[in-house]
Amino acid sequence: MGIRKYKPTTPGRRGASVADFVEITREHPEKSLVRPLHSKGGRNVYGRITTRHQGGGHKRAYRLIDFKRADKDGVPAKVAHIEYDPNRTARIALLHYADGEKRYILAPARLAQGDVVESGPGADIKPGNNLPLRNIPVGTVVHAIELRPGGGAKIARSAGASVQLVAKEGMYAQLRMPSGEIRNVDIRCRATVGEVGNAEQSNISWGKAGRMRWKGKRPSVRGVAMNPIDHPLGGGEGKSSGGRHPVSPWGKPEGRTRRKHKPSDKLIVRRRKSNKKR
């Protein structure tokens, strides 16, 4: 993937860039693997906003992605197409299995149209192949990793994401996450060799607010810019600091949204480095 920069013909074009899509081999998805997707606009079943800054955007169709692949062990598949998926940052690959079935998977880097991939304990260590962690050599870079055997891929699924297998001890494999955290995962869990493709996606400059609206993202307004009826930090004469610690629109302290004690914390071997200022 490459990035194409626009000439500054308008204020919205100035500094904007877009993917060149050279790896895309087909424009329309496989109809049998597409499902309708209803836009919720950040609302729940009662019509109340539960997630702010969402809504609008282009209509999308959901592509069914195979995050398990265990039921296709030993069945080779040919990469028929590399396609665009509006629901994720990664590209997706359409596989034609030898038994006639078609499925989508996340397209790893260096996977091209015409390549053959397979899954199972005996698969080769090459991009796109899916194996249990116990059958993958230490030091291998992997993505789309399960947290529980048979649970489907949960870790490292976005564009450019990868995890390194650094050790195996007993029933656990140690994985180095992109954050630097080292975590134990059941050695029976499956992973796909290689890193997720489309790594340059993070370097795209959107250029204007309208492009984010096309993606379904609405503006985020600062609390200090609101009126006091709308936010605890609102109001004041001129530009104010808000006069208190940052809080949500409902008065709860900003940040600290994660649980202090998660059951899976015992599987963390080494914590990620904190960015807090000492």
Swiss-Prot record:
GO terms for molecular function: rRNA binding; structural constituent of ribosome; transferase activity. Gene3D superfamilies: 2.30.30.30, Nucleic acid-binding proteins (2.40.50.140), Ribosomal protein L2, domain 3 (4.10.950.10). SMART domains: Ribosomal_L2 (SM01383), Ribosomal_L2_C (SM01382). Signal peptide: none annotated. GO terms for biological process: cytoplasmic translation. Keywords: Ribonucleoprotein, Ribosomal protein, RNA-binding, rRNA-binding. Residues 210-278 are annotated as: Disordered. One of the primary rRNA binding proteins. Required for association of the 30S and 50S subunits to form the 70S ribosome, for tRNA binding and peptide bond formation. It has been suggested to have peptidyltransferase activity; this is somewhat controversial. Makes several contacts with the 16S rRNA in the 70S ribosome. Belongs to the universal ribosomal protein uL2 family. This is Large ribosomal subunit protein uL2. It comes from Acidothermus cellulolyticus (strain ATCC 43068 / DSM 8971 / 11B). The gene is rplB.
